[in-house]
């Protein structure tokens, strides 16, 4: 495991490891259509369409199809719209666009996420790849960080012992704080607490109870977390 992967994996909360991952992996996920109109079930359906190759790698086109123009839609739910939600949506969309541009220019070579990273690093060197804001490596790294933020937020929400505002602040601390300077950490860290009530979030996810939302969130976690673990391990 690379130093980058080790550093990032250490930031995950305990809830993402061991029992939870094993439990949610047993949940049924529909392959025919989303189980509901909720963003959680919509994302579960599309992420569930990502099928590893015979070598166990992640097809780049399936990865992009799952997340482009979809992954950003929950920020308004989690943060009630406004400037922070807009910034987070812009960040994940820019990262996905960076990956897509590199893939579109190299479809014959960048067939899987693993091949994309391996080929680019071999050609340019890891240091150069991760300094270049237009590289596939940096686009994929920040895509991972954004998706890890969303997955971790929902893992905390499932536990139910924190308010949404506490979930937001803790998730930021776990997943993104280390990558921001002091001023950004202060401003963004405080803004992460501007979340709607749990009841409002449940309603915005199109559910009536915490239990219904938790079931859908667990389905989402079940399909997404293993892919995130696989992605960061190759960075």
List the predicted regions and their residue ranges.
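Long, contiguous alpha-helical bundle segments
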Residues: 18-235
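PEST-like, low-complexity acidic/proline-rich intrinsically disordered segments
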Residues: 1-22
């Amino acid at each position: 495991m690379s130093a980058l992967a080790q550093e990032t994996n250490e930031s995950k909360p305990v809830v993402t490891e061991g029992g939870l991952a094993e439990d949610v992996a047993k949940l049924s996920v529909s392959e025919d259509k989303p189980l509901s109109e909720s963003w959680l079930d919509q994302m579960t359906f599309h992420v569930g369409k990502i099928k590893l190759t015979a070598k166990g790698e992640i097809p780049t086109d399936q990865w992009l199809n799952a997340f482009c123009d979809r992954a950003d839609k929950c920020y308004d739910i989690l943060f009630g719209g406004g400037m922070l939600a807009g910034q987070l949506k812009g960040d994940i969309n820019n990262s996905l666009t960076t990956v897509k541009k590199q893939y579109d220019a190299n479809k014959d070579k960048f067939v899987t996420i693993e091949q994309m990273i391996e080929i680019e690093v071999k050609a340019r060197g890891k240091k150069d790849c991760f300094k270049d804001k237009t590289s596939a490596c940096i686009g994929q790294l920040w895509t991972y960080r954004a998706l890890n933020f969303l997955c971790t937020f929902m893992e905390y929400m499932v536990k139910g012992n924190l308010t949404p505002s506490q979930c937001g602040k803790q998730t930021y601390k776990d997943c993104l704080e280390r990558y921001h300077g002091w001023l950004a950490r202060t401003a963004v860290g405080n803004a992460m607490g501007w979340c709607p009530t749990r009841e409002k979030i449940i309603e915005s996810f199109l559910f009536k109870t915490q239990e219904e939302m938790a079931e859908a969130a667990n389905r989402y976690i079940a399909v997404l977390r293993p892919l995130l673990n696989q992605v960061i391990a190759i960075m």
